[in-house]
Amino acid sequence: MILIGLGAKARQGKNYVASYMKEAIPEIQFYSFADELKKYCRNHHNELEPQWQLAHQTNGTPLWKDDPIYGCTPILQWFGTEVMRKKDPNYWVKIVEEQLSKVTPNSINIITDVRFPNEADFIKDNGGYLVEVIRVNEDGTRYYDPGRDPNHLSEVALDDYGNWDFVIRCKSGDFTSLRYKALGVLQAIVQMHSLRDGSVPDGSGDDSDPSSLGPIYGGSSNWSK
């Protein structure tokens, strides 16, 4: 199994990177530590919002707006981090671990939202590869999502993490460069994994051009140990 973790801050392009990788190898599967959190919040938002308002001494316009998921980032952060991670830091990790226990040995799996050191450690402990995705403004400064608290633990927990295997840095809106870099990282990971585990990728291409990955880029992940 190839396991890839994408981190770390919000709105950096992690989902774009994942989608470009899946474009190259359609068999790639996505996982997210926040999937179950979003499902729970969707089903229990009428209970959670008053609790969040009380915990933060906040009253006023409901946070859920028209969408029970994408309009409630503060509640997702609060319940996922301050509530459930306090009970068990690995609560969300264990759910993904159970899901990954059912994948086939030659599968390629991407976790799209690595935000905390224990989540990153889970990737590394399972022989995976960590990719930090960094979005920068036109002037080269780091982009921060204006709709989120930049100091929330889920945004800063990996600021000093030094165990990334790859870093993809790209300007806002430069999707051509982002795609090129994503495919280059995918190619490198497949090759590294092949050398490490003795598997043989089916196909070859020009290392200088990730779009020439041959059968790998064309959608075949027929590599075996």
Kindly give the residue locations of the regions a language model identified.
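Post-Walker A helix-loop "phosphate-sensing" segment adjacent to the P-loop in P-loop NTPases
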Residues: 23-30
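Small-molecule kinase domains that catalyze NTP-dependent phosphoryl transfer to phosphate-bearing small molecules
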Residues: 7-10, 95, 118-125, 132-209, ...
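Short, well-ordered beta-to-alpha junction loops that form the rim of enzyme active sites
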Residues: 113-116
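ATP-dependent small-molecule kinase phosphotransfer cores
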Residues: 35-107
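Walker A/P-loop
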Residues: 15
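Extreme N-terminal starter segment of soluble prokaryotic enzymes
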Residues: 1-4
